[in-house]
Amino acid sequence: MPVLPDQCDLAIARYTIGQKCTPELLEEVRALANGAPVRATGPKYPSSWDLRPRRINLHTDANRIIVSIHCG
């Protein structure tokens, strides 16, 4: 079993900024992150406040365009 990092690698998802968030894009990022959790956040996406350092969060605007990324 692979050893997993304690925090996400944002470099993996940096290319998504400016793109429309789609289920396919989320799966693509998840695959690039070796199965690490990935989710969209923003006005169109309900989300919880739980903190998961390995998770990549793609924060979107009202048009579902990714405007920033962060771990958590």
Feature annotation, model-predicted:
Residues 1-72:
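Exposed, flexible binding/inhibitory loops of compact, secreted disulfide-stabilized domains
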